[in-house]
Amino acid sequence: MDLANREIIAYNFATRPKFSLVKKMLEQGLSRLKPTECPIIHSDQGVLYGTAEWVKMLEGKAVQSMSRRGNCYDNAVIESFFAILKSECFYSRSYHSIAELQAEIEEYLVYYNEKRIKLAFKGLSPVQYRAQYLS
């Protein structure tokens, strides 16, 4: 998630945590940047984000930031997003397969980025807010 406009810029799916999952997600996110841009990549203290391979992937491309142990406020923005995702996409619905669930999440992420307005952005979606900011 880009903290400037709350846009989901990279995501991936798996049935269990694997390094290939976060590696692909990082590659997706970094591919959207200009070569001169160096983002801050923030994560929790999950085991995948502390590996030597992860740190090496970030070298010269991004600054690593990790949440403090036991401090939920460090990840408040993404936790808020997941609460919204659950309330708007999961509660009171049932899915018959993982593929069906994945398709619904992908559709929701397009909606969230391009159409779902945010009051903090004066009624603009994350993509609209970014476009306005950059123009």
Model-derived segments and spans:
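Charged DNA-binding/catalytic regions of mobile-element recombinases
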Residues: M1-S135
